[in-house]
Swiss-Prot record:
Record-level GO BP terms: mRNA transport
Residue window of motif Nuclear export signal: 70-82
Gene designation: rev
Stretches that traverse the bilayer: none
Subcellular location: Host nucleus, Host nucleolus; Host cytoplasm
GO MF, one example: RNA binding
Subunit structure: Homomultimer; when bound to the RRE. Multimeric assembly is essential for activity.
Identification of the protein by name: Protein Rev
UniProt GO cellular component terms: host cell cytoplasm; host cell nucleolus
Motif (Nuclear localization signal and RNA-binding (RRE)): 29-45
InterPro entries: REV_protein
Pfam families: REV
Ranges where the record places region Homomultimerization: 13-21
Length: 89
């Protein structure tokens, strides 16, 4: 399934979020490095949750649009001209 411009924009935004949180440097004492990794990991979890919300909202919107289209298609089928039933003569 090819991605449209909206999906590409969302993917660029998600990629930017991940790039904005680089892995911590190896400088400092063991305790400082451990704390930096812990903070980095917590930020990664937040970014992951945010990315899920961004991408999940898009999928929900598509699902709502698909359901609306099905409802319209069904209404169109119901209102089409149907042939008269055979008469019992």
């Amino acid at each position: 399934m090819p991605l449209g411009p909206e999906e590409r924009r969302l993917l660029r935004l998600i990629a930017f979020l991940y790039r904005s949180n680089p892995y911590p440097s190896v400088e400092g004492t063991a305790r400082q490095r451990r704390r930096a990794r812990r903070r980095w990991k917590n930020r990664q979890k937040q970014i992951y949750a945010l990315a899920e919300r961004i991408w999940g909202t898009r999928q929900e919107d598509q699902l709502v649009q698909a359901i609306d289209q099905l409802v319209l298609d069904t209404q169109h089928l119901v209102t089409q001209q149907l042939p008269d039933p055979p008469s019992q003569a």
